[in-house]
Structure formats: C-alpha cells, structure tokens
Swiss-Prot record:
It is found in: Cytoplasm. ATP binds at K11, F59, R87, T93, R104, N114. The keyword NADP does not apply. Keywords: ATP-binding, Cytoplasm, Kinase, Magnesium, Metal-binding, Nucleotide metabolism, Nucleotide-binding, Phosphoprotein, Transferase. One of its GO terms (biological process) is GTP biosynthetic process. Pfam families: NDK. Major role in the synthesis of nucleoside triphosphates other than ATP. The ATP gamma phosphate is transferred to the NDP beta phosphate via a ping-pong mechanism, using a phosphorylated active-site intermediate. It comes from Sulfolobus acidocaldarius (strain ATCC 33909 / DSM 639 / JCM 8929 / NBRC 15157 / NCIMB 11770). The active site is at H117 (pros-phosphohistidine intermediate). This is Nucleoside diphosphate kinase. GO terms for molecular function: ATP binding; metal ion binding; nucleoside diphosphate kinase activity.
Length: 145
C-alpha cells in the first residue's frame, strides 16, 4: 500500500441535494484523511482548465455549464492507495453502470449529474489539486499539526 493524495470534488447537484456530509462521512469511515476542503463557485476558465481533456467533445459545453451552475466542494483526500480506492468508492460515471453502494450508484441522477469527480491518476491528482489549492506541499504539514 502506498500513501497517496487525490483530488475529489462534490459537484453542484451533490451540494444542491445536501449530500456533502454523507459523502465526506463515507471517505472518513474508509479511513481517509481530509487534508483540505473548500466550497467554491467555479468560473468558466477554471472549469475549462479542470476538464481540458474533454475540450472539443460534444458534451464539453454542457459539462462546463453544469459545473459552473452552483457551488462545488473541493477536497484533498489522503490515504492508502487513495487514487484507486476513491475511484472504486465513487463508481462508474454512468449511474446505470455504477454498483449499488458506490457514491454514484446510490446518488447519481444521470451521466451529467453524477454527484462527484475524483482524479483518475496520481499525475492528474497533482494537477487538479494545484488548480484549487495553490500550495499543496504546505497542506499536509498543516493538517497534521
């Protein structure tokens, strides 16, 4: 097992439906530490930066408009094999394919309103954490004080 950090974001539908506490509780019960957390109302430029891999795809504008439609909760989560374990916990993007017991399996309404985003690699996690938390290296030290 490797101690890792990953980026997790509760999307506007998750915030609007008051699922923030339940979702955070699932990560804590699994033994993860929440190193940083903040609620933001993302602007278009930040949303486009976060989802730049989808630029040019048919759903890109719809995705960006949805992400900027309301506040999101951004977190840095730390724990053993955080990237892969968190991805398993959130479930498949399409709620029809997400297993019951996963966050999306239990709460997602559609492919677009699927409650949560999590980094899919360590490299992406570093990039995504850097978008919302400028000094990631400082965060770990502060969290352990």
């Amino acid at each position: 097992m490797t101690l890792q950090r990953t980026f997790v974001m509760i999307k506007p539908d998750g915030v609007r439906r008051r699922l923030v506490g339940e979702i955070i509780s699932r990560f804590e019960k699994r033994g993860f530490n929440i190193l940083a957390l903040k609620m933001v109302h993302m602007d278009r430029a930040t949303a486009e930066r976060l989802y730049q891999e989808h630029k040019g795809k048919g759903f890109f504008n719809e995705l960006i408009n949805y992400i900027i439609s309301g506040p999101v909760v951004c977190m840095i989560i730390e724990g053993d094999d955080a990237v892969s374990v968190v991805r398993k916990m959130i479930g498949a993007t399409d709620p029809k394919e997400a297993s019951p017991g996963t966050i999306r399996g239990d709460y997602a309404l559609s492919k677009s309103e699927n409650v949560i985003h999590a980094s899919d690699s360590e490299e992406k996690a570093k990039t995504e954490m850097g978008i919302f938390f400028q000094d990631v290296t400082e965060i770990g030290a502060q969290a352990r004080m």
